[in-house]
């Protein structure tokens, strides 16, 4: 073999060895610094409800080293059951998805728990109940409200909207297929999915390349997106109507993802217009995060999981407390203009 070819092969082999050493070192570092999860699924798929996917009741799993426990109703809690409503208790139920479940964060540090703690400094009788389930959209929020929430005798409904995935139907329809036995509950993972290094860095590169090479199919994709928007916004309107009929104050907190705050403004603007048209009480938390200038990377659980950490939850709780705290006395009076109005006046979009 010619010397030039030998040198080329030597350079290639050296680069491959260096890459393998780098990957191995990165893998070891990530596994040493990121707590493991227990791995078992907390979900059950069922045709007993049109939610199709529910969390198993009275179970505990570990998410990134933090316990996630459910109560007898199948919602995140640190108690086995939601206690009976006490005299003069002001009960807030929170509907939402994975950013409200907040797996990977201690129960005491998720924003619903923090909100309860902070509002109790104003009124010790406040109780905040987390009724969120990962992967849900407004269609399922509505079902949770009607199937579970109203039976808990709430005094207020708080919807935690997550624009990044709330106006889609693909996850919901996949849940239905699994419940019907037409799709597997968990798809087998490729070998590289077990590597922390790939999940932290390689997947993003692969997704970026895929987004460039694979374009959605024009009219069909537009139709599906429009259908998803209409069905989920209609569900929000029905939630608002139910709240009005029950004379329950309603607030909609719109939560940002932990990536690309500025790019999210377009979608938040669309939701802002919808809220104003429908007179829905929406609070734009994206602007609250941008104003605080906290680096987005400091709000994620870790490099493998972009779900919110303790700092993100603390910001959400602080914003909600600043909006709801001053008007808590009016919220408690169902005969006041506040309780019967279509909007929560302090919880409107400011931008």
Model-derived features: where do they sit?
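Serine-dependent acyl-ester chemistry module
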Residues: 162-280, 285-298, 302, 334-351
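Generic structural signal for small/hydrophobic residues in well-ordered secondary structure
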Residues: 27, 97, 141, 157, ...
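Histidine-centered active-site loop/cap adjacent to the catalytic His
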Residues: 14, 301-345
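Membrane/wall-proximal cationic-aromatic binding patches
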Residues: 34-123, 289-293, 299-303, 351
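Solvent-exposed, polar/charged alpha-helical surfaces in well-ordered, non-transmembrane soluble domains
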Residues: 113, 117, 143, 234-237, ...
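Loop/turn elements at helix/coil->beta-strand transitions in domains of secreted/extracellular proteins
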Residues: 89-90, 124-126, 152-157, 244-251, ...
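Hydrophobic membrane-insertion alpha-helices, especially the h-region
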Residues: 11-27
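Conserved SGNH/GDSL esterase-like catalytic core that processes O-acyl groups on lipids
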Residues: 67-69, 91-93, 99-185
